[in-house]
Amino acid sequence: MPAFNRLFPLASLLLILWVGVCFPVCVEVPSETEAVQGNPMKLRCISCMKREEVEATTVVEWFYRPEGGKDFLIYEYRNGHQEVESPFQGRLQWNGSKDLQDVSITVLNVTLNDSGLYTCNVSREFEFEAHRPFVKTTRLIPLRVTEEAGEDFTSVVSEIMMYILLVFLTLWLLIEMIYCYRKVSKAEEAAQENASDYLAIPSENKENSAVPVEE
């Protein structure tokens, strides 16, 4: 049982990785909210669909609201990509997926004036035999653009924890391998000792031990 308890977390991790590879899974990951001036910035917008909702007509609208201003349309997907006339014209790039579950866009050459609130609206009309339901989802991305990249304390801590976990798993696997090797070696030594003891018995004793005594 202790060995099972030690192996169960690793088996669970391997099972999750196997499922993720064999069966694509949609995960609604939030977007980054900080960008550096002059670099590209991906505005992530993911709207997952259930398996039975594959057939759908999807319309995507991206809006931008500057600080103290109003929303205005900067990008639209309706039967194809369409970049509308705006201050972002020529700097927006479609970064979504073919199934339109990921409808992200990338802002090229980010400037300080690009700080503000970005809104991603995803409208879907599902095609069923009996009815055609309409669903709309909204994602808000408050973006802050800085002149230089600042050190993110959270990312540093996460990176340190990742390395610690990696070292721990490596040591754990090494200990398990040594334990299994010693266990197999002891089993082989015991088998060899039993075989040696059997060979050391005189042949007469072997015959007597093999033939039952009749009264």
Curated annotation (Swiss-Prot):
It holds the Pfam family V-set. It is found in: Cell membrane. The chain crosses the membrane at residues 157-178. Glycans are attached at residues 95, 109, 113, 121. Residues 23-156 are extracellular. The keyword Transport applies. One of its GO terms (biological process) is regulation of ventricular cardiac muscle cell membrane depolarization. It comes from the Eukaryota. One of its GO terms (cellular component) is voltage-gated sodium channel complex. Residues 1-22 form the signal peptide. A voltage-gated sodium (Nav) channel consists of an ion-conducting pore-forming alpha subunit functional on its own that is regulated by one or more beta subunits. Forms homodimers and homotrimers. SCN3B is non-covalently associated with alpha subunits and induces the formation of alpha subunit oligomers, including trimers. Interacts with SCN5A/Nav1.5; regulatory subunit of SCN5A/Nav1.5. Interacts with SCN7A/Nav2.1; probable regulatory subunit of SCN7A/Nav2.1. Interacts with SCN10A; regulatory subunit of SCN10A/Nav1.8. This is Sodium channel regulatory subunit beta-3. It comes from Bos taurus (Bovine).
